[in-house]
Amino acid sequence: MYTASGIKAYAQVSVESAVMSASPHQLIEMLFDGANSALVRARLFLEQGDVVAKGEALSKAINIIDNGLKAGLDQEKGGEIATNLSELYDYMIRRLLQANLRNDAQAIEEVEGLLSNIAEAWKQISPKASFQESR
């Protein structure tokens, strides 16, 4: 009934609407969710032997971690925690690059676990507390 391009356009509008109405705290949650989703897809593509799709999914996860989560850290206000997170994100990126080169599902799973732990901790933080000092 609907074309694939129509459905894709609707999904894009839905995502854009969610981003536009999200709080800064929710935007970070969305980045965690997006990175996790890309990692799950990468692992599934690896299991299916779809090397191209695996590479694209890992690239998306790396992009979200590097240009979203890491870039969003406030080194000045975050102090040691921000520095530690930045180093952990760098480690995750290296592991995902290795996973892509070596078709290493364990490396993907390792990053999934690390990211899941950080995301869970983020969800425990009050949205007010996470951005209160930014004002």
Curated annotation (Swiss-Prot):
| Annotated compartments | Cytoplasm, Cytosol
Known Pfam families for this protein?
A: FliS
Superkingdom in the source lineage: Bacteria
Q: Which GO terms describe its biological process?
A: bacterial-type flagellum assembly; bacterial-type flagellum-dependent cell motility
| SUPFAM superfamilies in the record | Flagellar export chaperone FliS (SSF101116)
Q: Extract one GO cellular component term from the record.
A: cytosol
- Name the predominant localization: cytoplasm
Q: Does the UniProt entry include the keyword Transmembrane helix?
A: no
Keywords assigned: Bacterial flagellum biogenesis, Chaperone, Cytoplasm
InterPro entries xrefs: FliS, FliS_sf
Record has Metal-binding as a keyword:
no
Family per UniProt?
Answer: Belongs to the FliS family.
| Protein name per Swiss-Prot or TrEMBL | Flagellar secretion chaperone FliS
What organism, scientifically named, is this protein from? Salmonella typhimurium (strain LT2 / SGSC1412 / ATCC 700720)
The organism's lineage is: Bacteria, Pseudomonadati, Pseudomonadota, Gammaproteobacteria, Enterobacterales
